Amino acid sequence: MEGVTYEMMLNVEQLERFGIHPTRLYATGGGATSDVWLKIKADILNRPITALSAKEVGAAGTCMLAGVAIGLYRDLRQAKEVFVKERKTYTPDAEQVAAYRPYYKAYRELYDAVRPIVEVINEKL
């Protein structure tokens, strides 16, 4: 769980390099049903994580877009009020955030060290 979340943190850092600073994240799908994993995500990512109630968010998103396209909803904000229901929000715990920090640093260093090897493998595929 932590490894996948460290990878998510790499993505968040990439967004931040481009000037996008997410202050809150949403979780969907199977992973959004695990209270333990969502708490880990909140602590590692140091941001609130809100789990959505919908199980099939792809289908819900399609319905939202279709509803706006045919005039059923004024815009996506209005469609969101109908389709998007928040189940629970997990907030970061400062002590846990600090505890995960050295592990993430080690993960990042390992990622950077292995990256050239992965590039060689990708060239051969």
What are these regions (language model features)?
Residues 1-125:
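Glycine/Thr-rich phosphate-binding loops that ligate phosphate moieties of nucleotide
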